[in-house]
Amino acid sequence: ADWLPALGLRFSLRMDGFAWVLALIVTGIGFLVVLYARYYLSAADPMPRFFAFFLAFMASMLGVVLAGNLIQLVLFWELTSLFSFLLIGYWHHNPAAREGARMALIVTSAGGLALFAGVLLIGRIAGSYDLDRVLAAGDLIRADPLYLPALLLVVLGALTKSAQFPFHFWLPHAMAAPTPVSAYLHSAAMVKLGVILLMRLWPVLSGTDAWMFSVGLAGLVTFVLGAYAAMFQHDLKGLLAYSTISHLGLITVLLGLNSPLALVAAIFHLMNHATFKASLFMAAGAIDHESGTRDIRRLSGLVHSMPITATAAMVAAAAMAGVPLL
């Protein structure tokens, strides 16, 4: 449908195999988190406001993964920043929630502006913002003098959204959000958008030394630092937050290798991470709800008092550790 005819922009959906997989992750895990939130939130929490923000957040995610042109993608990209701000700060009486929400909004919105500038450069080189035409113009874009600034701006936007070094600091502060928000944010929602963007534009921007060093190096540093920081966390959600940073760093490293096989591995791990991280966050929320603490130094014997939750958490943790067949 015509969106901004004067600029030659059309509102369109791109329903290729990659988009279908992402849409299933966004809606499938979103549906499970909605069910979980129904029983997790207390009667004192304003549920209509929560579910309105959450469903709008989910719709914005779908808008990004199904976008048929780059301007449309950036619009929904910024909407995810807005609704994540409202969800992270849902318990606005908590100063930590307000601080985490502001930090997430500032970092990701600034990255969104960088992405917008990069998209404008890509559109100028390709002569169109339509994703089909952009993906077909990879050789033209890589040969253009504007390729390097466009690449750096797009990568900057992706790194801020996926909490990659040196922009990783906002994600642990977002753990002040309700657990359903954390589960969705880490597994199928906003922090995945950066690596999803790099995957979507991989045919256009990859294949150069600039791509390998800007993407691969940032991912490698994030992968190592995230894993190191996770070892010293005592809060369950904090530990999972840093593990998310590390896993996204691993995905980013794979994308930076300029290898089609590494791209396939990155997409597979994206799906795997979405599944086990949602499970682990919901298990952490159940443990906190029943025991009153997320401090792992004070938790023991859960396999006896919460056998179902403990079993689900162990299976998800085994998947995170890369145990075969999981």
Residue ranges and their predicted role:
Residues 14-31, 106-107:
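Membrane-interface loop-to-helix entry segments
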Residues 32-48, 54-73, 82-326:
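Hydrophobic transmembrane alpha-helices and their helix-loop junctions in integral membrane proteins
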Residues 2-21, 137-151:
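Short aromatic-rich membrane-water interface segments that cap or initiate transmembrane helices
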Residues 78:
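Short phosphate-coordinating micro-motif centered on Lys-Gly-acidic
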